[in-house]
Each structure stands twice: as C-alpha cells, then as structure tokens.
From Swiss-Prot:
S-adenosyl-L-methionine binds at residues 19, 69, 93, 108, 112. Belongs to the TDD superfamily. TSR3 family. The lineage of its organism: Archaea, Thermoproteota, Thermoprotei, Thermoproteales, Thermoproteaceae. It catalyses: an N(1)-methylpseudouridine in rRNA + S-adenosyl-L-methionine = N(1)-methyl-N(3)-[(3S)-3-amino-3-carboxypropyl]pseudouridine in rRNA + S-methyl-5'-thioadenosine + H(+). GO terms for biological process: enzyme-directed rRNA pseudouridine synthesis. This is 16S rRNA aminocarboxypropyltransferase. Its EC number is 2.5.1.157. Coiled coil: none annotated.
C-alpha cells in the first residue's frame, strides 16, 4: 500500500512554481494547515537529522504516512529545528542531486516533489515515484540523474553519500553542506 503523503506548506515562495501545490492538486498529497496537523508517528523528512531514510522505513510509512514541511531552503534549518515537535520519526533523505530548474545539479536542494519521489523510490514504490515526477517535464530527469544512487539506497546501501560528498565522515560532510546551502541559496 502506497503511503499517504502529508504536507505543511509555509508560503515562502512563488505559488505558481511550487511543486507541493501541484502534488496536492493532482491528489498525490494532502495539505494540512499546521505542523500539529501532521500525523503523529509518521515519518517526517527533515534535512537536519543524521538518520537517513532506508527501505526498512516502508512499514512505518505505509501505516502512519510520510510528512513534509514545504519551505524555503534558506529557512529549512530554522524551520525543522525550531518547529517540529511531537511524535514523528525524523529521517533525512540520502544525498541526491536536484533536477528541478531552480537548483539543477546542486546536491541535496531538492524540490518537494523530488523529495516525495525519492522517499517513495527508496522505500520500494518505484512506479509511484515515476508517476509523481511525470507532473513536470523535468521530473523524470531526477530519476535519470540519480538512478544509480537511488538503486543503491533502495537496496539499503548508503555508500554513495561518501562518494558524492568526497569525504569519509558523512555526518560532518552533510553538516558542512547544509551550512553552505542555507547561507548561499
């Protein structure tokens, strides 16, 4: 059973370009009006935590759902560290490369639709991930760019992160990357 996707959206960008709005409009996600309205016990994608999403998270996502906060990358660290309260299972996505026109080729700065597709793919919902990405002309390019990484992540192998970061200490490398991304977006 495909996980239900819940999104709390902060109006920090152009709504005409917002991928979360399109996910909701086409029935792939449900918009909630506050962080408290996100389901307790759901997996929440949080770029500030150390624990990556893995295929073993599938069971939780199927029963409790997948939650996201749609916000500007410039404010992502503040939003995720200050506002997430409650009983969520916090996971970050493993390192991937953006295919969206705004951040094309940049590591980790994924749009909401890319994040949802990546999570679905990693948890074994590959067809559903492709279906979501087809909402945009550039969407399937996300899979093309990241195919070898997504396949390894979907098999539970997180070693591509070291390869993409070029460091052995993934936690430290991601911390440095987040600092650069949130200051220079």
């Amino acid at each position: 059973m495909i996980p239900r996707v819940f999104i709390y959206r902060l109006p920090q960008d152009d709504p005409r370009k917002n991928t979360a709005i399109k996910l909701v409009r086409f029935g792939f996600a449900q918009l909630v009006d506050s962080i408290k309205a996100l389901p307790s016990g759901s997996i929440i994608l949080d770029p500030t935590v150390k624990t990556p999403l893995t295929p073993s998270d599938r069971v939780i996502a199927e029963s409790r759902g997948l939650s996201l906060i749609d916000c500007s990358w410039k404010r992502a660290v503040d939003v995720h560290t200050k506002f997430i309260r409650g009983k969520f299972i916090r996971r970050r996505l493993p390192l991937l490369i953006a295919a969206n026109p705004t951040h094309y080729g940049k590591p980790y700065i994924l749009s909401t639709i890319e994040a949802v597709a990546a999570a679905l793919y990693i948890m074994g919902f590959k067809d559903e991930a492709m279906e979501v990405l087809r909402l945009y002309k550039w969407g399937p390019n996300f899979i093309i760019i990241n195919q070898k990484y997504l396949e390894r992540y979907a098999a539970g192998d997180l070693s591509p992160e070291r390869e993409l970061l070029g460091v052995d200490d993934v936690d430290n490398g991601l911390e440095q990357l987040m600092r650069v991304l949130t200051n220079g977006d």
